[in-house]
Amino acid sequence: MKFAVSVFFTLLLCGAALSQTPRIVTAPQANGTYGYRQSEIKILALGHNKLRIQMDLIFAYKSPVGPTANTGEASGEATIENDTAIFYPTDNHSCKITIKFLAGNKIKVTEEDTINCGFGMNVTSAGTYTKIKAGKPKFDEDR
């Protein structure tokens, strides 16, 4: 009985250790355009743990004169380790954005302090985005 209990706990601990093994994100998994509501994030793996990021963010709402929107943008390079990238936009180093790559072609984006990102009233990058186009995205600077 002691042996069976010992084996059970050993297997339980090994299983817990395996489930905590960090997931490495490959370039094909990362590359693409991700969408959430009307917002888009473009990601390109550059190698050496770097990602090129472009965010086109939209907060749509209805006003007395009809539909309108506030917008925000951010671009630059992020550093990725395992399945999590940290992004400070080129023009705003006080805005820390975390991008976590999830299973099912999704990313979860969080902002450390939304007000410091200065995207515009009610505009945020936060949310769970789904990959809407795989492969190398076209960035605004490339056009």
Language model features by range: what are they?
Residues T21-K42, S125-R143:
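Tryptophan-anchored aromatic micro-motifs
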Residues R23-G35, N49-R52, T79-Y88, K108:
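Short, hydrophobic/aromatic-rich segments at coil-to-beta transitions
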